[in-house]
Every structure is written in structure tokens, then in C-alpha cells.
């Protein structure tokens, strides 16, 4: 019985992770090209008898945000991410609008994964020698060229799927593996 509860809990967590990743990707698609880069402060270490350990930096003011063409910007105090100090998976966020007061603030922000940016962002260009993919000339992600090829193929398949759904509203988009593949990529951020 206890094992069944544990498995049910694991299933709920996995389902929630899939839903959360999918919703964030949809938000990314809807708000793109409003993308900001998150720059964390340098990591600090504390010397201990067993070696150096990373210390947690709890000061949100040390986290910096940048928007191409505007330089440094700030998260609006009403945002849920205003006091955030941990950005585990992605140094990118999307925002709905900018507001200029004493500072330039971003409103309604949402963290997005690199995979969401690759799938739903702008034009991709590959820099083979640097092993990077650049989105719209200003969002640089470290990845081999083969990732760009696969992402382009996924984008093409998704566009075909969406075009068919528009042409045939009764078409079941869940019938194929394209959507499942995209959701798995978003959930794992391409790690699988």
C-alpha cells in the first residue's frame, strides 16, 4: 500500500513537471521576443575542514537582468520573481511589458528553459567553431550543431501539426509522437 502511494506521488510530480514545462513553453511562445538574460553573481566558496563548499547567495539584488538594446533592467517589485535568487535550470526569462520609472522594470515575468527558446524562439543560426546556437542574433546557447538540426526538424513537424489542426479542427493532435517528443524535450530540457 505504501509503495502504491509513493508511485502515485511520483506520477503526480512527473505529471506536474510536464504541465509546468509545457505551460512555460506556451508562455515563451506567446511572449517571444520579450526575452531577458539572468546573470547570477559569482559563486562564492567557504573553506571547511573537508574542502571548499559553495555558499548560498541569498541577495536578490545581486542578480542582474539584461535585455538586448536596453542593457540592464530590473524585475518589477510586484513580480513573483522579484526576490528570487535561485535560477536552477535557465538563465532566461520572458516578460509581458517594460515599464520606465526611475528604472526600467520588467513586468509579468516567467522563467523559460533553453529548449523552449530553441523550439519557440526566433531564427536559429549555428556557430560551428564555438559549438553554439544563436537565436535572433542575441540569445546564445551552448550546443553542438546537431542539436540545431534536430530542433529545426521538430519545429517543422510542429508547424505541420498545427497547420493540420487549423485546417482540420477535429484532428487529434495527440495521435502522433511529435507532440509527445516535444513535451519530453521541454520536461527534460533536452537531457534525455
Segments (PLM) and residue ranges:
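C-terminal accessory domains/tails appended to large, multi-domain proteins
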Residues: 4-7, 11-192
